[in-house]
From Swiss-Prot:
Function noted in UniProt: Probable secreted effector that translocates into the nuclei of host cells to reprogram the expression of targeted genes by binding on effector binding elements in rice.
Organism: Pyricularia oryzae (strain 70-15 / ATCC MYA-4617 / FGSC 8958) (Rice blast fungus)
Principal place of residence: secreted
The name this protein goes by in its record: Host transcription reprogramming factor 5
GO cellular component annotations of the record: extracellular region; host cell nucleus
Biased composition (Polar residues): 35-50
A GO molecular function held by the record: zinc ion binding
Gene: HTR5
Induction of its expression: Expressed during multiple stages of host plant infection, including the prepenetration, early biotrophy, late biotrophy, transition and necrotrophy.
Keywords noted in UniProt: Host nucleus, Metal-binding, Secreted, Signal, Transcription, Transcription regulation, Virulence, Zinc, Zinc-finger
Signal peptide: 1-19
Biased composition (Basic and acidic residues): 69-85
Subcellular location: Secreted; Host nucleus
Length: 154
């Protein structure tokens, strides 16, 4: 029990002694933040040979964060490339696209595209994405006339 108390007292004294200002400055560090304070001379601690920056622990922490930033950038780039590739494969699988939307919406068959154009774009012509000159069969909803201005039940 006494050995434990002596060890605690020595740890407390070591902590207090490292926090006192010296001629090269104070060495008060937390786990995450470098809290150097100027001592009597006002010089920073990083100039002293026994500072945390000289031992390499500070560089290891800062080096880890910069490498994770590059890792994040690399992951974002890979994800963007995969999304572009998936989008192109989706366009290749689904031949019909809406020419009226700003982001070309693609559909696997003309019926789905017809429903989209009829409800959103009010019956404009439908085009095939692989052959834009070819017009698909227009979508006629059940119970509706072919003209959008015709007699429609309300």
């Amino acid at each position: 029990m006494q050995i434990l108390r002596i060890a605690q007292l020595m740890a407390l004294l070591a902590t207090c002694a490292s926090a006192l200002p010296t001629s090269t400055g104070s060495r008060v560090y937390s786990r995450d933040v470098d809290q150097t304070q100027g001592g009597f001379s006002g010089s920073p601690t990083t100039n002293s040979p026994d500072s945390v920056a000289e031992t390499g622990r500070l560089e290891a922490r800062s080096g880890g964060s910069s490498s994770t930033e590059t890792e994040k950038e690399r992951k974002k780039r890979i994800k963007a490339e995969q999304n572009a590739r998936i989008r192109q494969e989706e366009i290749n699988r689904k031949p019909y696209q809406c020419p009226y939307c700003s982001d070309p919406t693609v559909f696997s068959h003309s019926d789905a595209l017809g429903r989209h154009i009829y409800t959103i774009h009010r019956g404009m012509p439908i085009y095939n994405a692989k052959d834009p000159r070819k017009t698909a069969i227009p979508y006629n909803p059940p119970g509706r006339s072919t003209s959008i201005f015709g007699s429609e039940p309300f």
